[in-house]
Amino acid sequence: MKGTPVNRILSSAVKVAGSLALVGGAMAAAAAPAGATPPPTSAWGISAFGPVTIHPVAYTGVDGTPQVAGPVVVPGFVTTGGILDRAKRFQAYSQVGAVKVYGFSQVEQLNASMVSSTCRLSLFGGPPFGDATIQGGSIVAPDVPFFPSIPLIRNPAPNTVIHLGPLTVTLNKQTVTLGQLTVTGVYISGLGQNLSIAVSRCGVVDLG
């Protein structure tokens, strides 16, 4: 999306408002089992690593048991509403409500009424595939006079990138490692910090 109107507007806002910075701190939440081998499919609602650490919340594996969690609140960094995650043999799904990210000093917040991601394994030997949805999403920069909120795409293409000074916001982030596809609804990185919201993972499964 480099060079698009969204990036040009945000770039201007950053120049006026000054550099951005993530707020430090630390947090631990309900996590995936330590040292466990990743199952073929899995999902979790939110995680972060850096000065602020949030272990995967509402993690679920291939057993198909849905996991839910109440609001996640890290003052000055991120808050969410309810979280629902599901993982079955051939698909995974994550949904996070009422997302508000306060990880910028001059950009007030990135928010969305809901962020979700899903991935599926092909039944015919093809690669896994997935998608993400962002409902009511926007980025707000109140320190720039008369600067309107920038709406986020509801169904962004894979790896849609928005640059915010030293930070990078990736919508529908999709990566493949050793045959495993990881789909992250919203991924923010920069300044030694990252934040993942609505993560689904699908990998190779034995069909025998």
Where are these regions (language model features)?
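Secretory targeting and sorting signals
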Residues: M1-A36
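Extended, solvent-exposed, non-transmembrane regions
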Residues: A34-G208
